[in-house]
Swiss-Prot record:
Catalyzes a reversible aldol reaction between acetaldehyde and D-glyceraldehyde 3-phosphate to generate 2-deoxy-D-ribose 5-phosphate. This is Deoxyribose-phosphate aldolase. The keyword Acetylation does not apply. One of its GO terms (biological process) is carbohydrate catabolic process. It holds the Pfam family DeoC. Signal peptide: none annotated. Pathway: Carbohydrate degradation; 2-deoxy-D-ribose 1-phosphate degradation; D-glyceraldehyde 3-phosphate and acetaldehyde from 2-deoxy-alpha-D-ribose 1-phosphate: step 2/2. It is an enzyme of class 4 (lyase). Belongs to the DeoC/FbaB aldolase family. DeoC type 2 subfamily. Its main location: cytoplasm. InterPro entries: Aldolase_TIM (IPR013785), DeoC (IPR011343), DeoC/FbaB/LacD_aldolase (IPR002915), DeoC_typeII (IPR023649). It is found in: Cytoplasm. It catalyses: 2-deoxy-D-ribose 5-phosphate = D-glyceraldehyde 3-phosphate + acetaldehyde.
């Protein structure tokens, strides 16, 4: 197996196969569930809006893949600093049956100098998730923070407040995941000594098998080749799947989605 094939198989099994579009429908989510079951293995999860969780759960069970996890998003994509709303949305997502919640950090508040509200928001959402055995991923929106010091600070605050994963981006802004921001965030995980309990998720803009290989190589460099498993590493993507399958000898590499 070539290096690209090997990394593509790894990446496929680490994907949070995503649809977060305004025109999502039950039919599109059902199709996403079908795509998550591939000839070479399943994606780790799907990521959808909360209202589609029940139909996704039913579809995954019916197709014989109940182990594919269901992730959803809250405080999304705006990252406002209203803790009560973020918490209410997170509780609602849990009630819908989410296995994982990706909450947007109040990044604009941090840019304006307020570190406390981010900590408090993540902590509140973490307490709700922990009580239900739900994983919490925190989206810090690196492409808007831009500054390395702010990316580090948002990562540190999220981890201290209980994040199970730190995630680069919503996929809804001009600049999403980049290898540079990925390295900064994973270095924070390393420097804080939390690599056993905290994972990393690049999202938005990871579109090709070569992109995925590049991101995995950073993780391997920092933590060794065994770290990037489904508990410690995810790719938030949709169009990536077709490219990975093509690299693995399945399909033509074309995708209908741009995430």
């Amino acid at each position: 197996m070539t290096d690209l094939k090997a990394s593509s198989l790894r990446a496929l099994k680490l994907m949070d196969l995503t649809t977060l579009n305004d025109d999502d429908t039950d039919e599109k989510v059902i199709a996403l569930c079908h795509q998550a079951k591939t000839p070479v293995g399943n994606t780790a999860a799907i990521c959808i809006y909360p209202r589609f969780i029940p139909i996704a759960r039913k579809t995954l069970k019916e197709q014989g893949t109940p182990e594919i996890r269901i992730a959803t998003v809250t405080n999304f994509p705006h990252g406002n600093d209203d803790i009560e709303i973020a918490l209410a949305e997170t509780r609602a997502a849990i009630a819908y049956g989410a296995d994982e919640v990706d909450v947007v950090f109040p990044y604009r508040a941090l840019m304006a100098g307020n570190e406390q509200v981010g900590f408090d928001l993540v902590k509140a959402c973490k307490e709700a998730c922990a009580a239900a055995n739900v994983l919490l991923k925190v989206i810090i929106e690196t492409g808007e923070l831009k500054d390395e010091a702010l990316i580090r600070k948002a990562s540190e605050i999220s981890i201290k407040a209980g994040a199970d994963f730190i995630k680069t981006s919503t996929g809804k802004v001009a600049v999403n995941a980049t290898p540079e921001s990925a390295r900064i965030m994973m270095e924070v995980i390393r420097d804080m000594g939390v690599e056993k309990t905290v994972g990393f998720k690049p999202a938005g803009g990871v579109r090709t098998a070569e992109d995925a290989q590049k991101y995995l190589s950073i993780a391997d460099e920092l933590f060794g080749a065994d770290w990037a498993d489904a508990r410690h590493y995810r790719f938030g993507a949709s169009s990536l799947l077709a490219s990975l399958l093509k690299a693995l000898g399945h399909g033509d590499g074309k995708s209908a989605s741009s995430y």
